[in-house]
């Protein structure tokens, strides 16, 4: 078992073994995010699903109102005049079969891959290299589309794809320590609503198991999911 650093041990002792109201949890996370860089704020959510069954898989996108605070590198595989459109829209990598070959040889210098439908037969051959990294374009995730300019703009602005892993856990980076508590809360609330809205049809029993937030170098804090779901903004 990995030994905790003195810093982590000291920070962890301040956190009680209970669930916290969302804003209280975020305040603690921000207070503990005192590294010498702008730490990323993450959510780790265990759901009551078994993704080995197709009707219990969760994979979708969410547009966080305040973005993620991170810049992402986007690659686009398309053809014809769409290559120029991808370039002008801000894609970091773009191309046709040449980009397919480059990726097949191991060039994975991007965070997101978008493809137009006409190129998917060629992209499908990259399953061996894209699949394990979760980079295979998917219509449900908005990464297989004919409107590549809009897709690039949305993902650059903070739209992100997320999925439940094999254990039914969702890992999402939803902001930076420099964000205000309210901005982090609004991002977190949007994420929660998206997970509820996209609940797999085969999910049985208790859907939300545990919900933790943490920073890059800090301890995790458990969030009261019911309080997050029940929150209503003041009119």
Curated annotation (Swiss-Prot):
GO MF annotation terms: rRNA binding; structural constituent of ribosome; tRNA binding
Membrane-traversing stretches: none
Family annotation (HAMAP family): Ribosomal_uL1_B
Family of the protein in this entry: Belongs to the universal ribosomal protein uL1 family.
Keyword Repressor listed: yes
Organism: Prochlorococcus marinus (strain MIT 9515)
GO biological process, one term: regulation of translation
PANTHER family found in the cross-reference section: 54S RIBOSOMAL PROTEIN L1, MITOCHONDRIAL, LARGE RIBOSOMAL SUBUNIT PROTEIN UL1M
Name of this chain's protein: Large ribosomal subunit protein uL1
Keyword Lyase: no
Gene3D superfamilies in alphabetical order: 3.30.190.20, 3.40.50.790
Gene: rplA
SUPFAM superfamilies referenced in this protein's UniProt entry, alphabetically: Ribosomal protein L1 (SSF56808)
Quaternary organization: Part of the 50S ribosomal subunit.
A Pfam family matched in the record: Ribosomal_L1
């Amino acid at each position: 078992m990995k030994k905790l650093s003195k810093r982590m041990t000291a920070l962890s002792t301040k956190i009680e073994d209970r669930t916290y109201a969302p804003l209280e949890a975020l305040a603690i996370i921000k207070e503990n995010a005192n590294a010498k860089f702008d730490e990323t704020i993450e959510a780790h959510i265990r759901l009551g699903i078994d993704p080995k069954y197709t009707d219990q898989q969760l994979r979708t996108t969410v547009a966080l109102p305040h973005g993620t605070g991170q810049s992402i590198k986007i690659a686009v595989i398309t053809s014809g005049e769409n290559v120029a459109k991808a370039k002008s829209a801000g894609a970091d990598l773009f191309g046709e079969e040449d980009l397919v070959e480059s990726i097949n040889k191991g060039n994975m210098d991007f965070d997101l891959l978008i493809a137009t439908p006409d190129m998917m037969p060629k992209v499908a051959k990259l399953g061996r290299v894209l699949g394990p990294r979760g980079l295979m374009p998917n219509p449900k995730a908005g990464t297989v589309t004919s409107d590549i300019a809009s897709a690039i703009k949305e993902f650059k602005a903070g739209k992100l794809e997320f999925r439940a892993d094999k254990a039914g856990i969702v890992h999402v980076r939803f902001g930076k320590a420099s964000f205000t508590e309210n901005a982090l809360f609004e991002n977190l609330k949007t994420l929660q609503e998206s997970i509820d809205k996209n609940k797999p049809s085969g999910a049985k029993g208790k859907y939300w198991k545990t919900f933790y937030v943490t920073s890059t170098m800090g301890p995790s804090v458990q969030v009261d999911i019911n309080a997050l779901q029940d929150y209503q903004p003041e009119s």
